[in-house]
Amino acid sequence: MEEQQNEALEQRQNCCCLTGHRSLPSDPDRLAELRQNLRRLICDLAQQDITTFYTGGALGFDTMAAMMVLELKSRLPQLRLHLALPYPEQAKRWSRTDRLLYEQIKEHADRVYLVSMEYSAVCMKKRNYFMVDRSRACAYYMVNATRSGTAQTVNYARNQGCKLFDLLEKQPERFVKTPQQQQISWSEQVIVRESYPTAQEKSDPEK
């Protein structure tokens, strides 16, 4: 048992979870900046031997982050993409195009985890905590710092001692140590759009 715990701790040292909202910036410049910050951070973390990245497989930021890791693997082959899926039929109500992309990401991921075998009110939360529990660091895209699943995940990661990286900062390497540092005072002014909204996603507060 102790050997397994030590192995899990060692694996955690090489992992970072990526979390964010389903809604991405509608402003092309803000979206480009987010992508640039994410790309730079993944490359920087790889130099620190953090090479395994967890994403939750949802639409919006999760999809963008997963595709970024897969894109960078062409020149950083040590990178690994781990998908933590909340339940088997997550993509059932998505559009055909989104489902095809989802299946392609699953096919190219290094590992795929099913956190729950069926949908429940807490399956998204379980998925988020699953990723944090296996990560040394947590990089996040968050414009709602109070009422969102992303905020809940970031707070849990902070309590677990993860290094936090705010992808909206100009220097995403900044380690967020306190809730005061993490707050984004101008967040409510950022224009966002609902990416591929469905009735289920609109009612789901987990992202």
Where are the model-predicted features located?
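Acidic/glycine-enriched connector segments
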Residues: 2-187
